[in-house]
Amino acid sequence: MSLATLQGQSLDFAVKHSLDDLLKNPVRFRPAVVSSPSVPEGTYTVLNNPKQSTVSRKSFSAPTSPTRNKRSGSSSQEYKKSSGTRGDGANDFVDEDPAFIPPARILFPEEKLSMEWDNIMPNAPGLVNLGNTCFMNSVLQLMTQTPPLVQYLLSGQHSLSCRMNACVLCRMEQHVARAYPNKGTKRASAFKPSGIQSMLKVISSHFRPYRQEDAHEFMRYLVDAWQKSCLQNHKNLDHPSRETSVVHRIFGGYLRQQILCSVCKKPSNTYQALLDLSVDAKGSSLADSLKHFVHAEKLTKQNKYRCENCKQLVDASKQMTIYRAPNILTIHFKRFTFNGFQSSKISKQISYPESFNLGPYMSDPNCSCWYELIGVLVHAGGSTRSGHYYSFCKSSNGVWLKFDDDFVSNSSIDRVLNQQAYILQYKRKSTSSSKHKLNTENTVTKTSNKKRRKISF
């Protein structure tokens, strides 16, 4: 008998007995319990994820009124580090409504934030494409036309105290200084955004030079890196203190998730910090997308909710609303869907207004919170790894400009409103009633001895 035949028989014998052993002693699996959907580097939390379990998660809830009721059952993460707060060394959760937790330290006073342009600035210049960097250029142009951010960076406040060797916010400060080199009316010449490109690996380790990336993903990691820069001189800060950084003052807000028991009608409120809103692109308008975002989901059948008040699994409703509105509202349309290793794009037109009231989508529907459009980022192409990004931005003199890498041209509001938008940037209108405050359903109490609870996962 040949050696090959013996080896073949040995292999057949081993396979047969391995299968027999497996059938006699099968591997027993159990459902995994995860704290959030899997995403790159574990930074961001997917909102309204239809596959997300609502029963088997560790969680906590916040009081539903100023009387600070006892905790009731909840089934999702809340008041958690949002995108933009990673890297500060804290994974603790707090047990209370953000209205009841005064910050131990104020990093950036709210009254110093300037929402309107202090001066008419020269129009920002174009940015040279360094090789598949249109995703970066289009985001940088949006940020370079955001009044509170630009005016903070031009003041040079951050670099005066920064001690980081590789600081993304310092590089952004330098970038803005190049875009607005003087207070004259002459536009600067197009330049290479090499300072930001050289920080791609710092912004996120999976970014590669000269490779097309997703503009929204880059934006979120960029803002996240700015937040790290804001916190680098401050250790062991509580959540409320971290969220008084200039980054959160500009882009930050809160979501509220409310689960309402169908039996006892007792609500369970949980809160989460936000830096942008990602909404579905299935409707025909921004209003459709926002309505879908705040639409109440039924928890029933295999997805019932365990109510701590009723001490049993019950039918319930779950609704996400905006609890505190940000000063700069960034809205991302989820145009890309992924199936295995391929992605496809929802290319239909979605209408959006020049101004709108966010009030109907807030936790208190009686609130009035008006926004005006200041930027639109567009993706032309069929997937995140191909195509081209460009943006439309409203300049300090009210003129709309199109930024297509190093080419800058005048535009109009009619043309701006007729784009296949991927990202919208809105600025909160300055009125006496639209200050950066928590939703009025709760009253902020300025006490320093509030009990805080940390829960580790």
Curated annotation (Swiss-Prot):
EC numbers on record: 3.4.19.12
Gene Ontology terms: cellular component: cytosol; nucleolus; nucleus
Entry keyword set: Hydrolase, Phosphoprotein, Protease, Thiol protease, Ubl conjugation pathway
Gene that specifies this protein: ubp16
Domain USP: 125-429
Comp. bias (Polar residues): 45-67
Biased composition (Basic residues): 448-457
Coiled-coil segments on the chain, per record: none
Protein name per its UniProtKB record: Probable ubiquitin carboxyl-terminal hydrolase 16
Modification Phosphoserine, positions: S61, S65
Similarity remark: Belongs to the peptidase C19 family.
Catalytic reactions of this protein: Thiol-dependent hydrolysis of ester, thioester, amide, peptide and isopeptide bonds formed by the C-terminal Gly of ubiquitin (a 76-residue protein attached to proteins as an intracellular targeting signal)
Gene Ontology biological-process annotations: protein deubiquitination; proteolysis; regulation of protein stability
InterPro entries found in the cross-reference section: Papain-like_cys_pep_sf, Peptidase_C19, Peptidase_C19_UCH, USP_CS, USP_dom
Pfam family, one: UCH
Organism domain of life: Eukaryota
Signal peptide bounds: none
Region spans: Disordered: 34-97, 434-457
Active site: C134 (nucleophile), H388 (proton acceptor)
GO-annotated molecular function: cysteine-type deubiquitinase activity; deubiquitinase activity; metal-dependent deubiquitinase activity
Record PTM Phosphothreonine, positions in chain: T64
